[in-house]
Amino acid sequence: MTTIGTRKRVAVVTGASSGIGEATARTLAAQGFHVVAVARRADRITALANQIGGTAIVADVTDDAAVEALARALSRVDVLVNNAGGAKGLQFVADADLEHWRWMWDTNVLGTLRVTRALLPKLIDSGDGLIVTVTSIAAIEVYDGGAGYTAAKHAQGALHRTLRGELLGKPVRLTEIAPGAVETEFSLVRFDGDQQRADAVYAGMTPLVAADVAEVIGFVATRPSHVNLDQIVIRPRDQASASRRATHPVR
């Protein structure tokens, strides 16, 4: 077991190698947390941890043994940010790729379950724990071509909201963050590295950036312990739903 040499509160952030996870790690570190950055890409989280004075732990949330090792490595956890996740493809149900569906389920749903279950005893023992789960507006909406992702995100949201009730009376708060369009590596992963397709997702609009979501997570993490922000939906001004958005001329 690793005892972090600080009396600071400890925040574990999954998917911390880029995007919302990286921005959240930086935000929480600036607020005084000792951040444990968790992701698969060792080079990125090691550099991040060095920059923010945190700890890097390489782990894949789809790997049972890796998540168990993560839990053993930590002597204290005050905040958990379940951020690891993603989408694959944009096929209609009739053309669904089962491997894509399996990946999305294992990463978004079972990944959140594995990490939360493994760290929950330490969050309770902290006496003032917080679980933030980054879902998506896809957890509350559906859209054509998005069934695999929306199904996974609906399930992830249901997991989180169920836990909210199951932990009543325990010293742990739970907040679901449901972002809309955020320009990160998300679309690049979804379209298997096709930069042109990824760029087209945000063309003609002003999307959120990772720091926008991280700022909200930082706000949640610094509320008094009796205040529970159950769900926060955050979209760009240009987006009303997953399928409704404003488009401006490209200058």
From Swiss-Prot:
Disulfide bridge partners, by residue number: none
The keyword Cell inner membrane belongs to this UniProt entry's keyword annotation: no
Class of the enzyme per the UniProt entry, highest EC level: oxidoreductase
Enzyme Commission number: 1.-.-.-
Active site per database record: Y149
Keywords of the record: Oxidoreductase
Record-listed NADP(+) binding positions: 12-36
Annotated positions binding substrate: S136
Recorded GO CC terms: plasma membrane
Signal sequence coordinates: none
The keyword Oxidoreductase is annotated on this UniProt entry: yes
An annotated Gene Ontology molecular function: oxidoreductase activity, acting on the CH-OH group of donors, NAD or NADP as acceptor
Family: Belongs to the short-chain dehydrogenases/reductases (SDR) family.
PANTHER family documented for this protein: ALCOHOL DEHYDROGENASE
Name assigned to this protein: Uncharacterized oxidoreductase Rv0484c
Source species: Mycobacterium tuberculosis (strain ATCC 25618 / H37Rv)
Lineage: Bacteria, Bacillati, Actinomycetota, Actinomycetes, Mycobacteriales
